[in-house]
């Protein structure tokens, strides 16, 4: 007996993509970030990560809407991942002006998203390792509210 899923309901059970938003999983993000940090160290480039935190009271539909806004706001070569239930990250790569790219991404999301969210970004030239970059992103002192700036 063959069971078929309705068209338009993709499922992912391979831990490569998040099954709810279909963005990359945390494992894929960590691997990509390690590669980009190594590349930045070798080539003298910068790598940037922007973290977005959606409020705890956001519904499932609002999370999907935010995930879609991220997808529309990024450049083709950037990578979106969902780290936790309410945390998304965007890996900005292949850009000489990473700081400006971080600012532009946040501004594009602010223009589309009416609800409040928090964000932070961290930049590395390869001298900061994966753990240092992630700790910097988790520092609540650098988290900004979308309504305060």
Spell out what each predicted region is.
Residues 1-19, 23-38:
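Signal-transducing coiled-coil linker helices
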Residues 69, 79-82:
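A short pre-motif secondary-structure segment
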Residues 23-45, 68-72, 140:
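Short regulatory alpha-helical coupling segments
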Residues 14-19, 52-62, 74:
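Active-site loop/short helix in cyclic nucleotide turnover domains
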Residues 60-65, 99-100, 124-149:
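Catalytic cores and conserved motifs of cyclic dinucleotide signaling enzymes
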Residues 57-65, 89-108:
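Short helix/loop segment flanking the catalytic signature motif in cyclic-nucleotide metabolism enzymes
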């Amino acid at each position: 007996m063959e069971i078929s899923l309705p068209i338009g309901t993709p499922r992912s059970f391979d831990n490569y993509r998040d099954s709810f938003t279909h963005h990359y999983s945390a494992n894929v993000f960590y691997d990509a970030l390690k590669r980009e940090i190594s590349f930045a160290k070798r080539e003298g480039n910068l790598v940037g990560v922007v973290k977005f935190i959606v409020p705890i009271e956001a519904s499932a539909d609002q999370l999907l809407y935010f995930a879609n806004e991220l997808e529309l706001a990024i450049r083709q070569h950037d990578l979106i991942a969902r780290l936790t239930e309410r945390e998304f990250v965007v890996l900005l790569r292949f850009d000489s002006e990473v700081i400006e790219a971080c600012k532009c991404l946040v501004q594009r999301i602010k223009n589309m998203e009416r609800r409040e969210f928090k964000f932070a970004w961290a930049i590395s030239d390869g001298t900061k390792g994966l753990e240092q970059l992630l700790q910097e992103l988790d520092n609540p002192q650098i988290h900004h509210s979308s309504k305060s700036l």
